[in-house]
Amino acid sequence: MQWCRSQTNCRVFTDSCHIKACLIYNAADSFHQGTRKSQQYYDSAIRICPDYAEAWHEISVPYLKRGDFFTWRKYMDRAVALKPYPYLGTRGWCRWKFLRDYEGALTDLRRFDTLSQFHPSNSGDGTYNLYIVMALCERELGHYPQAFHYFSLGIDSVLAQQGDKWIGFLDYLHRAVTKMRISDYPEALRDLERQIKKYDNFAEIYYYQGLILHLMNLDKDALTSLEKAKSLAAANHHLSDIYCEMPDEVFMEDIDEAIDRIKKK
């Protein structure tokens, strides 16, 4: 996967340093991301214009994807120093997704939120509204009231202002799991029903539905949901990411264990 970027309009610059760096930066698109040639082009752009933030960001990305977080951070921090907006948002999302650095991610994303004047933005891969990322960070730190605050901003406010089509494909699922963790089972089931209406082809939806129904002593219904989860997982319809385990992702072993646990009850 290559996170897409648009070509920069080099005409917005007036000095020759930025214009030359911009042209070289755009030319790097002729080569596959992370190849020696591509990296050399970004390095050349930086040498010509050391304050060209976009080149610092792009040269960092292959290191992130390869797991060289030290080198990624060295370059990414330079991009953030030069352009806090938008790169605080990018760095915060990456700290959450790749490093599970929940506190660090929240620090970046709160600063980004202020700089953006509290206008929600999406994660670098387009999967999440950054308020959902902030909610998941708070959840993993055990800060449930704060998590629900950000879920409300990322779901309820977006729904009211922009409509259902702007709600992420996984948002209701993650909020449902969070509600399950605090034993709010009826509301968790309601969010899963919303998730099913939004997009119903993930095994995780029915796995968590099954767990909640089991916790409510509705074991027959729980088994029905878990069997559906197993069928979807067997058909490869489950959460997945080529770089990291996703939040609330489940595996066939999890589903089988849940089914066995109920049958042995």
Where are these regions (language model features)?
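Structural motif corresponding to the intra-repeat A-B loop/turn of tetratricopeptide repeats
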Residues: 32, 66, 98-99, 141, ...
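Flexible helix-coil transition and linker loops at the boundaries of alpha-helical arrays
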Residues: 9-13, 43-47, 77-82, 113-127, ...
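TPR alpha-solenoid repeat register
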Residues: 55, 87-89, 122, 130, ...
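Alpha-helical adaptor scaffolds
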Residues: 136-197
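TPR/TPR-like (Sel1-like) alpha-helical repeat modules
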Residues: 80-84, 96, 107-115, 149-156, ...
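Terminal, low-structured helical/coil segments at or just beyond the last alpha-helical repeat
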Residues: 9-16, 166, 223-265
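N-terminal leader/linker segments that initiate helical-solenoid repeat arrays
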Residues: 4-57, 65-68, 74, 263
